[in-house]
């Protein structure tokens, strides 16, 4: 008699994805982040569901409902801070996952990579709308500034912004629709993640060497389940420490002030995980140019597979490309720092140089370096 997990219509799908899936023997802990992201999404959906039971999406009561959750609901404070800091963990895992893909050449699985880019955009949209919901000062002004960027689109821009706002300013209609979309999008993200996984299992996982490993595979369970559980424990430890010891470390104090349309905060800035893109946006003096640069800073990921000029897939044996990769990482950290600083000298020029560096490294220097490495290896 065949094993039930191999014959049952539903169980065999789970079995082929999580139990008997052949996985390269050489993959390292950098391959843990997919499962960590699914864990983050599960935490976010669960905590979000419990928060939605007590939250009211009305401008008059939204701020007070969040206060009520933290003060009066049993363990409301921990649910709220798990949700807020869970988003930060989500983006840390997301950026490390993308970095891994860039370093080891996983972007050559184009369908998986493109679905991943869609997932990134969906996650960013969800996080942005979630930041608006507590209806603090930074929520209101962040929503006003970021949605207003769409007015840079020629001809239809102003109408588009008013259509999104549901009026002539960010108000009750905006908050209600943002809550609706913020609730809906995580389920779309979960569906996209399934498609992401489906395409990945069509090709099989990449590995650190970048060399096909069809002859050297091991089953996912128990080897990688144990490895993933270790990563999960480490991530949950960090998240717990963040939530229990300094829950407001990554937040903005301005968001503890109720939204006031008549009083602009001194420095309007998004959450830390958007600061690199915000710095690129601010580094261009022209509004439309800034918006284009902002979108392209993420959309540039879609171009990377076409810029792969190396004869080797992974950067594991390419020291010059490795140096460039870590320069790019440092550049992104500099942009993140600049995004949180006021618009004044010397931050303006540092932001502009870092923005130019970001696009130049990806579009010009990396492909040329790969060609040089091919030449040095006489390929």
Curated annotation (Swiss-Prot):
It is found in: Mitochondrion inner membrane. Its main location: mitochondrion. GO terms for molecular function: metal ion binding; ubiquinol-cytochrome-c reductase activity. It is a multi-pass membrane protein. It comes from the Eukaryota. One of its GO terms (biological process) is mitochondrial electron transport, ubiquinol to cytochrome c. Changing residue 150 to R: In strain: Isolate TK 17633. One of its GO terms (cellular component) is mitochondrial inner membrane. Heme b b566 binds at residues 97, 196. Heme 1 (or BL or b562) is low-potential and absorbs at about 562 nm, and heme 2 (or BH or b566) is high-potential and absorbs at about 566 nm. PANTHER family: CYTOCHROME B (PTHR19271:SF16). The cytochrome bc1 complex contains 11 subunits: 3 respiratory subunits (MT-CYB, CYC1 and UQCRFS1), 2 core proteins (UQCRC1 and UQCRC2) and 6 low-molecular weight proteins (UQCRH/QCR6, UQCRB/QCR7, UQCRQ/QCR8, UQCR10/QCR9, UQCR11/QCR10 and a cleavage product of UQCRFS1). This cytochrome bc1 complex then forms a dimer. This is Cytochrome b. It comes from Noctilio albiventris. The lineage of its organism: Eukaryota, Metazoa, Chordata, Craniata, Vertebrata. The gene is MT-CYB.
């Amino acid at each position: 008699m065949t094993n039930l997990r191999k014959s049952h219509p539903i169980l065999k799908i789970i079995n082929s994805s999580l139990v008997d899936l052949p996985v390269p023997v050489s993959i390292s802990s950098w391959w843990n982040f997919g499962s960590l992201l699914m864990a983050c999404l599960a935490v976010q959906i669960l905590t979000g569901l419990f928060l939605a039971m007590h939250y009211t999406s009305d401008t008059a009561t939204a701020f007070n409902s969040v206060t009520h959750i933290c003060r009066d609901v049993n363990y409301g404070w921990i649910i709220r801070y798990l949700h807020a800091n869970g988003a930060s963990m989500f983006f840390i895992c997301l950026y490390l996952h993308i970095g891994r893909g860039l370093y080891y050449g996983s972007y050559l699985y184009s369908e998986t990579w493109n679905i991943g880019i869609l997932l990134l955009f969906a996650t960013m949209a969800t996080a942005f709308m979630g930041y608006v919901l507590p209806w603090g000062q930074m929520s209101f002004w962040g929503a006003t500034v970021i949605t207003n960027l769409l007015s840079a689109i020629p001809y239809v821009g102003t109408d588009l912004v008013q259509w999104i706002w549901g009026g002539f300013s960010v108000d009750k209609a905006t908050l209600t629709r943002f809550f609706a979309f913020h609730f809906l999008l995580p389920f779309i993200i979960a569906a996209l993640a399934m498609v992401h996984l489906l395409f990945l299992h069509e090709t099989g996982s990449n590995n650190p060497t970048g060399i096909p490993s069809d002859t050297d595979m091991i089953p996912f369970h128990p080897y990688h389940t144990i490895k993933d559980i270790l990563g999960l424990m480490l991530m949950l430890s960090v998240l717990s420490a963040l939530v229990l010891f300094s829950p407001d470390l990554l937040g903005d104090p301005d968001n503890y002030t109720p939204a006031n349309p008549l009083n602009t905060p001194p420095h309007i800035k998004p959450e830390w995980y958007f600061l690199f893109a915000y710095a690129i946006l601010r580094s261009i003096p022209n509004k439309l140019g800034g918006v284009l640069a902002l979108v392209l800073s993420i959309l540039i990921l879609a171009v990377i597979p076409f810029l792969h000029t190396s004869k080797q897939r992974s950067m594991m044996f390419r020291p010059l490309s490795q140096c460039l990769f870590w320069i790019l990482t440092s550049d992104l950290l500099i942009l993140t720092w600049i995004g949180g600083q006021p618009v004044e000298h010397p931050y303006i020029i540092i932001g502009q140089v870092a923005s130019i560096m970001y696009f130049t490294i990806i579009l010009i220097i990396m492909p040329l370096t790969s060609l040089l490495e091919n030449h040095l290896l006489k390929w």
